[in-house]
Every structure is written in C-alpha cells, then in structure tokens.
C-alpha cells in the first residue's frame, strides 16, 4: 500500500502544510474548534478548494478525476449524509463481521437508517466507508457521539484492520487519552501551522 503525502496544502487559515503519513500509520490531529481540522481533511479528500496538493504513493491529487481520488482517499465526516432507507443499501458489500464487532445485530442490515441513534450512524458511516476498500482514511472525530465502552470497542476493531490493510490514516481525535492510545504521531493546529506534540508523556 502507498503512503499519503501533503505538499504545501493551504485551506482557510492553514498555510503551507507538509505531512507524510506512512502505510498503516495513524497520525492524530487536534486543535481548538474552528482551527481548520475538518477543512484540512476536506482539502486532502478533494472536497474543498485548496492550494497545494496531496499524493497517494506516486499519484498526485490533481492528476486523476475528483471522484476517483475520493474513492481512494475517503473521509468519514463528523456528520454523514444518508441517501437510502435501509442500512444494507449503504454498504458497497456485506460486512457482517464489522457490524457484529461494532454492536449491531444480524437484523441491522434491514433496518431503516432513520431508527438509528447518532452514535449508531457514526459507527455505520465508518463501516460504509471501509466497505468500499479505500487506500487512505480521513476520520473526523469518528467517536465523538460514542460512550467510552463503545469507543474502545470501535478502536479494538478498527486498529487491527488499519494495520492489516496498511492504510495511512489522518484522525481528528477526541481527547488526549485517545491520542495516547492511537497515534503514531500527533500534530496540534496552532495558528496556521501544524505543531508536532509528544504522543505519550
């Protein structure tokens, strides 16, 4: 699998962002509300106009059609859109093991999305994205609506999968404890720059 490289990314207040994420590495991002964390992920996934570029392996973002890039570098936003009624219709392929690991029952695939809680939708959004087999993953606080037990359950399922698929991951993390559990490296947004912080103290 290929690594993800950010070259001179500029979006919103952020300027000249350079970052390399190795295959299988989780790089956590943090910073105050409005600092640009989500906008940076949207720029990398080609969902928002920006300066600079991103690369996945040797392929530059602007060298392929936007929809093809977004199929490889996939973002799970804090709030996802749902186009179909049933859970199963949102999955590119059946993922019963993933649904079970995240606390869903055998009948979940036939459920209407409208009956799911915000936390269940957040978990389902992650399963939906992984069912499309992306080559890089951008996660915008994917556990923000989950309690501690469910958060740990999601992490225990997701981390081995990231290592197995060797996915480079940018993860906007929810709190310092989570960063210490997950991050290979941690960058805090300060002003217009990324400042590397120690992961474990």
Feature annotation, model-predicted:
Residues 172-174:
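H-loop/switch region of ABC-family ATPase nucleotide-binding domains
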Residues 112-116, 120:
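Conserved ABC ATPase signature
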Residues 72, 79-98:
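Q-loop/switch helix immediately C-terminal to the Walker
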Residues 45:
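Helix-to-loop junction immediately C-terminal to a conserved catalytic motif
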Residues 60-74:
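ABC ATPase NBD coupling module
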Residues 126:
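Hydrophobic anchor residue at the start of the ABC signature
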Residues 137-141:
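Catalytic Walker B motif of ABC-type/P-loop ATPase nucleotide-binding domains
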């Amino acid at each position: 699998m290929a690594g993800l490289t950010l070259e001179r990314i500029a979006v919103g207040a952020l300027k000249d962002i350079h970052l390399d994420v190795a295959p299988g590495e989780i790089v956590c991002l943090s910073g105050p509300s409005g600092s640009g964390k989500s906008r940076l992920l949207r720029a990398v996934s080609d969902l928002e106009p920006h300066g600079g570029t991103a690369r996945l392996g040797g392929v530059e973002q602007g060298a392929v059609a936007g929809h093809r890039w977004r199929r490889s570098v996939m973002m799970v936003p804090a709030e996802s859109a749902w186009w179909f009624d049933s859970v199963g219709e949102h999955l590119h392929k059946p993922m019963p093991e993933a649904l079970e690991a995240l606390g869903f029952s055998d009948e979940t695939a036939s459920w209407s999305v409208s009956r799911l809680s915000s936390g269940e939708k957040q978990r389902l959004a992650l399963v939906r994205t992984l069912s499309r087999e992306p080559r890089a993953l951008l996660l915008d606080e994917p556990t923000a609506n989950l309690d501690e037990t469910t958060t740990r359950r999601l992490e225990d399922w997701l981390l081995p999968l990231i290592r197995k698929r060797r996915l480079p991951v940018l993860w906007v993390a929810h709190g310092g404890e989570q960063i210490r559990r997950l991050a290979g490296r941690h960058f805090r947004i300060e002003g217009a720059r990324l400042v590397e912080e120690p992961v474990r103290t």
